[in-house]
Every structure is written in structure tokens, then in C-alpha cells.
Design a protein with these regions (language model features):
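Structured beta-strand-rich core segments of catalytic domains in phosphoester-bond hydrolases
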Residues: 1-11, 15, 99, 107, ...
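Non-catalytic surface loops within mature trypsin-like serine protease
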Residues: 17, 103-105, 135
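Soluble catalytic domains of enzymes that build or remodel membrane lipids, polysaccharides, and related
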Residues: 1-7, 16-33
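Extracytoplasmic/periplasmic, Sec-exported soluble proteins
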Residues: 18-22, 47, 89
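Active-site beta-strand/loop signature of hydrolases that rely on acidic residues for catalysis
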Residues: 9-13, 27-55, 67, 101, ...
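Active site of divalent-metal-dependent phosphoester/diester hydrolases
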Residues: 49-123
């Protein structure tokens, strides 16, 4: 921050949604690059893989934590991808593909997914994921 000189690294991504190989290699490059920093890291984005899959485990089993689970208070934790559809069918799994990941040195106070629809319309095909953090 300008006030106290605190430095951190914020990286954002949108991994490929069609090619599993591109997604796998993209994540590997991100993690390899991010772990080189001595400063705290915040890695955000549309990762195009679901919570619990192998890539999610790779992302969160090392130096990064999913802010949803690191948060002192989880205000909501719903679906992050809507595809502009108001209802998820019973046989469709929740589509949580957007994450805020943090390294040591980052405290997550709150986490939430903002699932409001102004005027009943989706402003995007993704809901905003918000974390209040301290570095």
C-alpha cells in the first residue's frame, strides 16, 4: 500500500474452457510463476474447473489456499458460473469455477458470491466472487 509500503503480487487468469491440456498447462505455469515470489500472492480468476477436481487439488494443495475455506467468515458460497441461466437443473452439479486464492501472509476476513440480479437480469455469465483480505 502507499501508506505503509506493503507489497503483494496479484495475478488474474482466465484458463481455457475447451482444452483440458491448455487448462492443465496454464495452471502449471501460473503456479510455477507465483511460487517464486517472496511477497504474499493473490491469484484470482475464471479457472474453468470445478471445486474438488484434480486441477483444483493441485491449485490448493501447495502454497495457495482457496479464500472460501480460508475466510474467517463465509457470507455465501454459491454457484459462480450461471451461463445466464436462472435455474440449475437437478442433474447439473453446481458450477463453481471462479476462485480467489491466497498465499501465506494474506488473511481472508470474509468471502462471498454476489448472486444478485438487478431487474431480474444477469449482468454477466459469472457472479462476482468477493473476498475482504488483509496483507
Amino acid at each position: 500500500s502507499k501508506e505503509d509500503g506493503t507489497v503483494y503480487v496479484h495475478m488474474n487468469t482466465h484458463l481455457d474452457h475447451r482444452g483440458p491440456e491448455a487448462r492443465t498447462k496454464g495452471l502449471a505455469q501460473l503456479l510455477s510463476f507465483a511460487e517464486k515470489f517472496s511477497e504474499p500472492v493473490v491469484l484470482t480468476g475464471d479457472f474453468n474447473f470445478e471445486e474438488g477436481c484434480e486441477l483444483y487439488k493441485q491449485m490448493t494443495s501447495g502454497f495457495l489456499k482457496d479464500s472460501k475455506y480460508a475466510a474467517k467468515e463465509r457470507l455465501s458460497d454459491g454457484v459462480t458460473f450461471t451461463g445466464f441461466y436462472p435455474v440449475i437443473k437437478d442433474n447439473d452439479p453446481p458450477q463453481i469455477i471462479d476462485y480467489i486464492n491466497v498465499s501465506d501472509g494474506v488473511t481472508v476476513d470474509t468471502y462471498r458470491v454476489i448472486d444478485e440480479r438487478p431487474d431480474g437480469k444477469f449482468p454477466s455469465d459469472h457472479y462476482p466472487v468477493v473476498a475482504e483480505i488483509e496483507i
